[in-house]
Design a protein with these regions (language model features):
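Short alpha-helical segment that forms part of, or immediately flanks, the ligand-binding pocket
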Residues: 92, 110, 114-119, 133-134
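Nucleotide-activated donor-binding/catalytic signature segment of Leloir-type glycosyltransferases, i.e.
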Residues: 60-85
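Aromatic "clamp/platform" in nucleotide-sugar-dependent glycosyltransferases that forms part
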Residues: 106
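Conserved acidic donor-binding segment of nucleotide-sugar-dependent glycosyltransferases
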Residues: 138-139, 143-149, 158-163
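Short alpha-helical donor nucleotide-sugar binding micro-motif in glycosyltransferases
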Residues: 84, 92-98
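Short acidic/histidine- and often glycine-rich active-site loop of Leloir-type glycosyltransferases
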Residues: 59, 128-139, 143-144
Length: 192
């Protein structure tokens, strides 16, 4: 399923696909992601940024200056800025193709995107101490990193060099972070 989704998106099936979905605004800690990706550009991966926002042009400039995008040979690009996606089917395909979801935001208090990724067996790496980190058990259903470029890059390197831990965390994320509407309805009825 993952390989088929990668093929549909013209992404190499033999390299990890890293994903960020959300507003392209500084509050989401997107600069940290780009700078951390530059520190691990010697590793095989491709990062996909889905969304739009006031910081998108600056993000693209930073990525180009760091040699991550805008190369004359697009196959050397490590980052693609995909833009906004309105189609649920396309978004599902993107999450399915992804191997690791990047979400170091300390701005969000209960992001749905981490659970969306988990529902399609994509674990997340989040900032330790953020509200999102409260639902992540490091190495079990996702990954934690300090809110620092070097720490995030080191954590990415550790994860990317050990693809089997991504598989374990993907299974854990799907088992522990995903809840059906029926489960939620029962919980609401029990409380009220």
């Amino acid at each position: 399923m993952k390989w088929a989704a990668k093929n549909e998106l013209y992404v190499a099936v033999d390299e990890p696909l890293l994903l960020f979905v959300g507003q392209h605004i500084w509050e989401k800690n997107v600069k940290l992601i780009i700078e951390a990706l530059a520190k691990v550009k010697d590793l095989p991966y491709h990062a996909l940024f889905v969304g739009d926002g006031y910081a998108r042009a600056d993000m693209q400039t930073i990525a180009a200056k760091l040699g991550l995008s805008g190369n004359s040979d697009y196959r050397k690009d490590k980052i693609t800025f995909f833009g906004s996606v309105q189609s649920r089917e396309l978004m599902q395909m993107i999450y399915t193709a992804a191997d690791l979801f990047l979400f170091p935001s300390i701005y969000d208090n209960a992001p749905l995107v981490v659970r969306e990724a988990a529902s399609l067996f994509t674990p997340s790496i989040v900032a330790r101490g953020s509200n999102t980190a409260e639902i992540i058990q490091d190495g079990i259903n996702g990954f934690l990193s300090d809110n620092d470029v070097t720490a995030f890059a080191n954590r990415l390197r550790y994860i990317l060099e050990r693809p089997t831990i991504i598989s374990w965390a993907a299974k854990g994320a799907a088992e522990t972070l995903v809840r059906s509407w029926e489960d939620i309805a029962v919980e609401v009825l029990d409380r009220y």
